[in-house]
Amino acid sequence: MENFKLKIKKEDKVKVLTGKDKGKIGKVLKVLRKKNRAVVENINVAKIHQRPTQANPQGGIVDKPMPVDCSNLMIMCNSCIKPVRVGIKQLEDGKKVRICKSCNEQIDA
């Protein structure tokens, strides 16, 4: 696998475009660059059977969010409050920031 240049980062608010969780909005917990996937909070949740350990002596069935392909996610813009395409703009000081394609506002905090 090759590394992809992803525009989705950890802590981003994203909307799911396709699949069983279509239309849901969640926060990105983890980005898997090599697999072009992201783990999103409360999206694509699977039930995992966990055996008892010292940390969790009870064990049992646990809900765990599984990775979603990044092509099925779209970043939510904070200013226009809708899913948008993302562009990259270079500031005068040379720093690159992500911008919303529809309102040209900066997405990065």
Swiss-Prot record:
GO CC term, one of those recorded: ribosome
Cross-referenced PROSITE patterns: RIBOSOMAL_L24
Entry superkingdom: Bacteria
MF terms (GO), sorted A to Z: rRNA binding; structural constituent of ribosome
Annotated GO biological process: translation
CDD domains referenced in this protein's UniProt entry, alphabetically: KOW_RPL26
Alphabetized UniProt keyword annotations: Ribonucleoprotein, Ribosomal protein, RNA-binding, rRNA-binding
One Pfam family hit: ribosomal_L24
Cystine connections: none
Family under the similarity heading: Belongs to the universal ribosomal protein uL24 family.
Function: One of two assembly initiator proteins, it binds directly to the 5'-end of the 23S rRNA, where it nucleates assembly of the 50S subunit.
NCBIfam families for the chain: rplX_bact
Subunit structure: Part of the 50S ribosomal subunit.
Name of the molecule in the record: Large ribosomal subunit protein uL24
